[in-house]
Amino acid sequence: MDAEFWNNRFAAPQYIYGEAPNAFVAEMASQIPPGPVLCLAEGEGRNAVHLATLGHRVTAVDQSEAGLAKARRLAAARGVKI
């Protein structure tokens, strides 16, 4: 799947996978030591934003600019920066 596929998929205003982190990230977040976190293939940002709300310095990367734009909006709505 390429960037065009994901840009089309993330073009809708709603968050395809929701705004809450996935179960794995929610369960394991407390095990991540303080500091920088790199979130690869982050999509719409739900995991990155969750980690940022816990105080991590998060860099989110994805091939979809549409997904990253939604991630930035979600981060702003939660008062964090990714």
Can you say where each PLM-predicted feature lies in the sequence?
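Conserved class I S-adenosyl-L-methionine
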Residues: 1-32, 35-43
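Conserved SAM/SAH-binding beta-strand->alpha-helix loop
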Residues: 64-66
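Conserved SAM-binding strand-loop segment of SAM-dependent methyltransferases
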Residues: 78-82
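Conserved SAM-binding motif I beta-strand of class I
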Residues: 57-62
